[in-house]
């Protein structure tokens, strides 16, 4: 009996041709695994496609709730954004997909797992670090690092010779990754950062110039940093993100066109659509501005930077990320309230924040007289706060330039 390998399968170009390749080159029995992270497409047809491509069995795992609850919301609460733009939609999904890959491999008694990430990208690292963290005994096969196929055109030719249909053409070889948090676009004409993305690239989001001429107000309610309702309607985590994707996409929210620094050492250009995630990130920051004290907020901003790097680099299942999550959860104990935003032609504007834990005291902030703040006290504060500067100026000796 042949040994088994579990393949992270999407039905796209790369994983479609990996099934016959694994059988031809390793002699493995191939078990395909599809993780439903909210791709927005019907996944059942992949059963027939995987079997026709040579798979012995296929699992289709609905992990949308787990994805949002255990991965997206912790990232949102941390405020993790990579290089000021990227809301980590692909990055944060990979550890969950790899986790399911390991679980099915253990269930099936497989000796190996395989993925379709290329040898130039970040995903190979994210998949494999997760596998190493969860089951280091599993062999990892990355065909893109082994086979003779060197381009997407070669891959298309390989598929056509074996009668495998793929949703890619040689004229427009965009690489897309979609889940309920975002949609990414890479490859083709997008590889030239001097070229504006064609309008037909956008699938979730209206171009801002085609968005409605009237703004729309949206109210989001948070409890301990997690969104729970939109416009007063309580929603499940998955329903909430789908709802905000619809609203944000209509108004051209969440389009990020960026050149990023890949973990593997090169720069790459990608176009990301994250309408709901962009609204949530904005609203969450607004609420934190009302409920977090200055020192906690500033330190949390440093944590957010590191948290984003850990996610981007595939280090989700690490002691450091788990420790940072514990810190973040502590900061979120008072991040409860409602945030009202205005959506208009690609922009989000704050339109009101309320919280039972608000640290904003109007009497302190006003420029008028009050009984809580004596403006004369400021002189002593400035003298003490500025003492190091004064001492340095008094003791500094002239030096030659």
UniProtKB/Swiss-Prot annotation:
It comes from Carboxydothermus hydrogenoformans (strain ATCC BAA-161 / DSM 6008 / Z-2901). Disulfide bonds: none annotated. This is Argininosuccinate synthase. It catalyses: L-citrulline + L-aspartate + ATP = 2-(N(omega)-L-arginino)succinate + AMP + diphosphate + H(+). The keyword Ligase applies. Its EC number is 6.3.4.5. Pathway: Amino-acid biosynthesis; L-arginine biosynthesis; L-arginine from L-ornithine and carbamoyl phosphate: step 2/3. SUPFAM superfamilies: Adenine nucleotide alpha hydrolases-like, Argininosuccinate synthetase, C-terminal domain. Belongs to the argininosuccinate synthase family. Type 1 subfamily. It is found in: Cytoplasm. L-citrulline binds at residues 86, 91, 122, 126, 175, 184, 260, 272. Keywords: Amino-acid biosynthesis, Arginine biosynthesis, ATP-binding, Cytoplasm, Ligase, Nucleotide-binding. It holds the Pfam family Arginosuc_synth.
């Amino acid at each position: 009996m042949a040994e088994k390998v579990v393949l992270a399968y999407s039905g796209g170009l790369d994983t479609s041709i990996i099934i016959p390749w694994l059988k031809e080159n390793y002699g493995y029995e191939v078990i395909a695994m599809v993780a439903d992270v909210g791709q927005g497409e019907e996944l059942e047809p992949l059963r027939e496609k995987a079997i026709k491509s040579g798979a012995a069995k296929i699992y289709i795992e609905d992990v949308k709730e787990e994805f949002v609850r255990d991965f997206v919301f912790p990232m949102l609460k941390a405020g993790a954004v990579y290089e000021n733009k990227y809301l980590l939609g692909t990055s944060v999904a990979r550890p969950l997909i790899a986790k399911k890959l390991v679980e099915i491999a253990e269930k099936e008694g497989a000796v190996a797992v395989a993925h379709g990430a290329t040898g130039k990208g970040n995903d190979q690292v994210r998949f494999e670090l997760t596998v190493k963290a969860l089951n280091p005994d599993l062999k990892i096969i990355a065909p893109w690092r082994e086979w003779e196929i060197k381009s997407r055109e070669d891959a298309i030719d390989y598929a056509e010779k074996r009668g495998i249909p793929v949703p890619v053409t040689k004229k427009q070889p965009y690489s897309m990754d979609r889940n309920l948090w975002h949609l990414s676009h890479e490859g083709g004409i997008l590889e030239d950062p001097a070229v504006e993305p064609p309008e037909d690239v956008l699938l979730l989001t209206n171009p801002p110039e085609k968005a409605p001429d009237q703004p729309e107000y949206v109210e989001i309610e948070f409890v301990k940093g997690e969104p729970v309702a939109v416009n007063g309607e309580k929603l499940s985590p998955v329903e909430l993100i789908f709802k905000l994707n619809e609203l944000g996409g209509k108004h051209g929210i969440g389009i990020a066109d960026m050149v990023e620094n890949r973990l593997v050492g090169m720069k790459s250009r990608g176009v990301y659509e994250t309408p709901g995630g962009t609204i949530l990130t904005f609203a969450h920051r607004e609420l934190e501005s009302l409920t977090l004290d200055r020192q906690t907020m500033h330190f949390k901003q440093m944590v957010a930077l590191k948290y984003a790097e850990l996610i981007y680099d595939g280090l989700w299942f690490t002691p450091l990320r788990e420790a940072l999550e514990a810190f973040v959860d502590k900061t979120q104990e008072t991040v409860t309230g409602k945030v009202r935003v205005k959506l208009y032609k690609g922009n989000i504007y704050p339109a009101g924040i309320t919280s039972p834990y608000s640290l904003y005291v109007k009497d302190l902030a006003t420029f008028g007289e009050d009984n809580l703040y004596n403006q004369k006290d400021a002189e002593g504060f400035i003298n003490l706060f500025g003492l190091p500067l004064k001492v340095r100026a008094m003791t500094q000796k002239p030096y030659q330039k």
